Swiss-Prot record:
Binding annotation for Zn(2+): 79, 81, 95, 98
Organism in which the protein naturally occurs: Streptococcus suis (strain 05ZYH33)
A GO-annotated cellular component: nucleoid
Keywords: Cytoplasm, DNA replication, DNA replication inhibitor, Metal-binding, Zinc
Annotated protein name in UniProt: Replication initiation control protein YabA
Similarity remark: Belongs to the YabA family.
Co-factor requirement: Zn(2+)
UniProt keyword Glycosyltransferase present: no
Major location category of this protein: cytoplasm
Subcellular location: Cytoplasm, Nucleoid
UniProt cofactor note: Binds 1 zinc ion per subunit.
HAMAP family, per database record: YabA (MF_01159)
């Protein structure tokens, strides 16, 4: 092997390493997204379990059970309007459609 072949081989190896590094970075970013989503889902699941346990312990249902249930869902940070039902509210910001539903008689 002469010097040019060695240099070319090292250059190819360097390019392969850069490509591999870019792939590893992409995988790390994807994994971070999956971890964040998993954390969010675990938190939501925990809140839902706590509310379910609380409802099981109370055992009674009032005549306004449906409205109370919607209020609890909204207070837990979820939409109750027909446009975004069940989706998490960003930073628990109020939704005018959800609030309108809660204020109906």
């Amino acid at each position: 092997m002469d010097k040019k072949e060695i240099f070319d081989a090292l250059d190819d190896f360097s390019q392969n390493l850069l490509t591999t590094l870019a792939e590893v970075d992409a995988i790390k970013k994807h994994l971070q997204g999956v971890i964040d989503e998993n954390t969010t889902l675990r938190l939501e699941n925990s809140k839902l379990r706590e509310r379910l346990e609380k409802e099981d312990k109370t055992g009674h249902k009032s005549s306004n059970f449906g409205k109370e249930n919607l209020e609890n869902i909204y207070e837990d940070g979820f939409h109750i309007c027909t446009f975004s039902y069940g989706q998490r509210r960003d930073n628990d910001e109020p939704c005018m459609f959800c609030v309108e539903l809660l204020n109906r008689d």
